Amino acid sequence: MTARIDAAFARCRAEGRAALVTYVMAGDPDPETSLKVLEALPKAGADIVEFGLPFTDPMADGPAIQAAGLRALKAGQDLRGTLALVRRFREGDDRTPVVLMGYYNPIHTYGVPHFLEDAQAAGIDGLIVVDLPPEEDEELCLPALEKGLAFIRLATPTTDEARLPAVLANTAGFVYYVSITGVTGTATPDFGRVSQAVSRITAHTNLPVVVGFGVKTGAHAAEIARGADGVVVGSALVDALARSLEPGDRAGSGTVEAVTSLVRELAQGVRSTAKAPAGA
């Protein structure tokens, strides 16, 4: 299923721009609203969607995404329900790549072979599992690749030259560069160093490199887009959704628009910025 991911980046390259990768939490604030948001993202300008798997112990996530996960869990969202939402999304959109992002525990509990069968059938294109290092590739990464699912790795400012080949060895789809250290949504990246970091990674791989963590505005997205193949935005979108909720964490009449209006701003930032030449 990496074909959809490859095609998305090819379209963006043809337009001379970076891709916009948007993250939302599955089931936040409830499954039906979550599906409406998912369906609206590509129409607002998202090229690729990361769909978060709610989990009780999200160690790499900041307060915004932790709160989103709790709202989703409270609404009854689980892995089976998340795959069901993607199946419904695919009824109307067979073009936009969907990448599941989360932690290994729910997948392990579901059962890896069963999960991979169901994920493939639902129309999932790739996986980001933040707590499975390369040393544990046999657990999920290699079986996922055999099923045709991309397994996407994270690289960070602390990933040195000795570690990078291991991180990239079985990566497929794209590489996700975490532009700051720490948890999501808690700082602003050093935009000046992003292009240098991307160049360091692309010296070791031909895969697209997307950059995330700390991108909050269209201006931020435009800065990142100059030197990366894609810009990832998550916490800012989750925050926008949270601010739109009514008491009791209920979706309001403007909840979907709260997310998509920011996506349109981010898409404008990405689309207004020509990518810098390699090495610039």
Swiss-Prot record:
Q: Which GO terms describe its cellular component?
A: cytosol
Question: Gene3D superfamilies in the record, alphabetically?
Answer: Aldolase class I
Swiss-Prot/TrEMBL catalytic activity: (1S,2R)-1-C-(indol-3-yl)glycerol 3-phosphate + L-serine = D-glyceraldehyde 3-phosphate + L-tryptophan + H2O
Q: Which InterPro entries match?
A: Aldolase_TIM, RibuloseP-bd_barrel, Trp_synthase_suA
Q: Which GO terms describe its molecular function?
A: tryptophan synthase activity
- Residue stretches in coiled coil: none
User: What is the E.C. number?
Assistant: 4.2.1.20
Recorded hits in CDD domains, A to Z, give: Tryptophan_synthase_alpha
User: What pathway does the annotation place this protein in?
Assistant: Amino-acid biosynthesis; L-tryptophan biosynthesis; L-tryptophan from chorismate: step 5/5
The alphabetized UniProt keywords are:
Amino-acid biosynthesis, Aromatic amino acid biosynthesis, Lyase, Tryptophan biosynthesis
Q: Where is the active site?
A: E50 (proton acceptor), D61 (proton acceptor)
Keyword Ligase carried by entry: no
Task: Write one Pfam family the protein is assigned to.
Answer: Trp_syntA
Describe the function of this protein. Answer: The alpha subunit is responsible for the aldol cleavage of indoleglycerol phosphate to indole and glyceraldehyde 3-phosphate.
Which family does this protein fall into?
A: Belongs to the TrpA family.
User: What HAMAP family does this protein map onto?
Assistant: Trp_synth_alpha (MF_00131)
Self-association state and partner proteins as the record states: Tetramer of two alpha and two beta chains.
> What is the protein named?
Tryptophan synthase alpha chain
The species this protein was found in: Methylorubrum extorquens (strain PA1)
Q: What is the lineage of its organism?
A: Bacteria, Pseudomonadati, Pseudomonadota, Alphaproteobacteria, Hyphomicrobiales
